[in-house]
């Protein structure tokens, strides 16, 4: 497993979908300003990323940045994963919460 790190995607889903350096069981971490969850009732970008994660058998993790919809982020169910609390956005997409330490 390899961990791939990027940041400041600012809702540019194509940037993540075009990245082709992953292998089975890899993880892509977005370190702030993920931006895919901005408008309520618009989950099209999350659906694209989830389908991509299923197809490539990878995980998407993200840390929030200052350009996020925090109200939406706080609405996702919280669970324990990677040794800390995460917000479960979908089966393959998790929000890494502030103040937590993770072992990935």
Q: What are these model-predicted stretches?
A:
Residues 6, 11-103:
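Core catalytic region of metal-dependent phosphoesterases/phosphodiesterases
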Residues 1-4:
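Extreme N-terminal starter segment of soluble prokaryotic enzymes
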């Amino acid at each position: 497993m390899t961990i791939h790190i990027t940041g400041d995607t600012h809702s540019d889903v194509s940037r993540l979908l075009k990245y082709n350096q992953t292998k089975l069981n890899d993880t892509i971490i977005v370190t702030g300003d993920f931006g895919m969850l901005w408008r309520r009732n618009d989950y099209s970008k999350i659906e694209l990323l989830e389908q991509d994660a299923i197809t490539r058998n990878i995980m998407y993790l993200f840390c929030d940045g200052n350009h996020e919809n925090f109200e939406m982020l706080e609405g996702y169910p919280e669970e324990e994963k990677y040794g800390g609390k995460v917000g479960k956005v979908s089966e393959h997409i998790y929000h890494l919460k502030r103040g937590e330490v993770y072992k990935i």
